[in-house]
A protein has these predicted regions:
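Basic polycationic patches enriched in arginine
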Residues: 8-11
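Polybasic, lysine-rich low-complexity intrinsically disordered segments
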Residues: 3-5, 24
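Pyridoxal 5′-phosphate
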Residues: 14-428
Length: 428
């Protein structure tokens, strides 16, 4: 087999990563996109294997193997409830975090519309599962108020309160932004909602497993989470619904999940999400400290060594593993491809919207100009990442950013170094 060039993706059988050009040695993959998804932890894998290798009973069946499957579901539910300081009867499993978001928004809207409440409040930089649910409701006659965050990416309770109307049914504000990592004052926002007898939901998909989340302390009515964000498999999520709150069912059919969410339970996924969240919360302080150390190293070094690089979002109240940085004069897609050729996985924003070349709605909402937003990169760290990987990322950025800027008309013009030519080829 011909020896591949350094930094080139190996297409040869048996090699699935990158090669360093020396005897076909695979280059280590540096995965820095943990906000998009995370690798399964050993506890989750063990739970999946136990569920799949065991009896294949349906949890709703009234015989021994059905009871065994139900025990796995009950254990997973109890683990999730304990991690959130909720009661097991307040945890309802879904197929993903987006399903939980849809359930909270649409289920509340349809439930309370009969009372004449057809107004909802959310933020302008929510995940698209919330924004698209709100847009659907607007198309059928509901009204939605979108609260803009400040320039650092924070929602202020007084702005939310100013948008409340007598017919407001729901306030939904995310706990931590999926692109810039800013953590919102959920306890204060929930208190504002309850002062006006309004239900409050938070999309905590990026928060659960990354920072402490206590539903009783926060005072939320509904909360969405997704297993693959904290080292469980994809395809399993959950919603916390406080006792006394009853949004309309999103899926109708059988009597699963206390007749709240139809469909045979994903036993292996439920076992895994419980095991993964238990593991994440048991080691949470150490995990947060480790991720924040890597995050701060990258932010400090990049802002120091790369001209005009800027951090997007406030630094103090921020997810410990999130660094979203703009590199003016470049397109994020260009940086992304260069990083990929060096074995580094990162993103230009939310993986759920990565096919779009439009500037991030999150960055636009905090007032970033489109040209700056186009050059933004998101690096998100997990417990498996190392300081060596953080150093390698910075080394790579310090090599590719100046090189790409030297070829960028946008950057050269901003620096006053570009020579502009007319269509006839004459230098202006």
């Amino acid at each position: 087999m011909e020896n591949p060039k350094p930094g080139r993706l190996c297409r040869s059988p048996g090699i699935s990563a990158y090669c360093d050009g020396k005897e076909n040695t695979p280059m280590k993959l540096v995965y820095l996109d943990n906000a998009a998804t995370t690798p399964c932890c050993p506890q989750a894998l063990a739970a999946v294997n136990k569920a799949l290798d065991g009896p294949c009973g349906n949890p709703s069946s009234h015989y021994s193997v059905g009871y065994e499957a139900k025990q796995l579901v009950d254990t997973g539910r109890a683990q999730v409830a304990k991690a959130l300081n909720a009661d097991p009867g307040e945890i309802f499993f879904t197929g993903c975090g987006s399903e939980a978001d849809n359930w909270a928004v649409k289920g509340t809207a349809f439930k309370l519309a009969a009372q004449g409440k057809k107004h909802l409040i959310t933020s302008a930089f929510e995940h698209h599962a919330i924004l698209h649910s709100m847009a659907m409701l607007e198309r059928i006659g509901f009204e939605v108020s979108y609260i803009k965050p400040d320039s650092e990416g924070y929602i202020h309770p007084e702005d939310v309160e100013a948008a409340i109307r007598p017919d407001t049914a729901l306030i939904s504000i995310m706990m931590a932004n999926n692109e810039i990592g800013t953590i919102q004052p959920i306890k204060e926002l929930a208190a504002v909602a309850h002062a006006h007898k309004i239900w409050f939901h938070t999309d905590a998909v990026q928060a659960v497993g990354a920072i402490p989340v206590d539903v009783k302390e926060l005072g939320v009515d509904m909360l969405s989470l997704s297993g693959h964000k904290f080292n469980a498999p994809k395809g399993i999520g959950a919603m916390y619904i406080r006792k006394g709150i009853s949004p309309w069912n999103f899926l109708d059919g059988g009597g699963q999940e206390s007749r709240r969410r139809a469909g045979t339970e994903n036993v292996a996924g439920i076992a895994a999400i419980g095991a993964a969240l238990e593991a994440a919360t048991q080691n949470l302080p150490a995990r947060m400290e480790h991720e924040q150390k890597l995050r701060d190293y990258v932010i400090d070094r990049v802002l120091k060594n790369i001209p005009q690089a800027r951090l997007n979002g406030g630094r103090d109240k921020r997810l410990p593993g999130n660094a979203n940085i703009s590199f003016p004069g470049l397109e994020g897609e260009t940086i992304l491809l260069d990083l990929d050729m060096h074995g580094i996985c990162a993103s230009t924003g939310s993986a759920c919207n990565s096919d779009s070349l439009d500037p991030s709605h999150v960055l636009l909402s905090i007032g970033l100009p489109e040209e700056i937003g186009h050059g933004s990169m998101r690096f998100t760290f997990g417990p498996q990442n190392t300081m060596q990987e953080a150093e390698y990322l910075c080394d790579t950025l310090e090599e590719i950013i100046p090189r790409r800027r030297a070829m960028s008309c946008m950057w050269l013009q901003s620096e006053g170094k570009a020579r502009v030519f007319s269509l006839k080829g004459e230098k202006q």
